[in-house]
Amino acid sequence: MGRRKLCAASAVGPDSDRVLMAANDWLSERRTEVAADRILDAAEELFTRHDPGSVGMNEIAKAAGCSRATLYRYYENREALRTAYVNRETYRLFDAIKEKISGITDPRERLGAGIATTLRLVRESPALSSWFATTQPPIGAELAEQSDVITALAAAFVNSLGADDPAVVENRGRWLVRVITSLLIFPGRDVADELAMVEEFVVPIVVPVEQRA
């Protein structure tokens, strides 16, 4: 009987405390992620209705239903919040693009379809397309150029077209980002016109003849 009591007591001893602390840490981290996402969701709604460059931290805090102090606890400034938003949407966009072009194996066709799908998905999103409005400063292009996440995912896409030297892959990925942002700011006459330009001027650089063969 005494042994049973001892075992029962040990069940809520140091090991159990560590388990509870780990669980609490996980819950705390999860709550932080949820709160951060809610703030970005509120910012997204504002980006949909207003020029992203005019949206400040005061407006975002009000839309998110939190104080400025709380907002700054998650994002130290507007640039950090913008970067977090762009990175989140880039991951989502990349996953959607991969799914839509998953059945295309030819590198040339895959590249054209990937660019066309990217342009279409961004343009269909009021929040994302607002970053590339010609009536506003090119904030979207600037963020795309500065984002390590966008650069890395673009390089990963280029790498999926065929193995190559890592430095070459990175350079082609950066070039691809510039091409896409340029088309978002200065679109072609229509989808066919843009695809024709991609096939003539982008494919030969990103997917050389020897690589396609």
Where would I find each of the regions flagged by the language model?
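Amphipathic alpha-helical segments used for helix-helix packing
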Residues: 113, 117-148
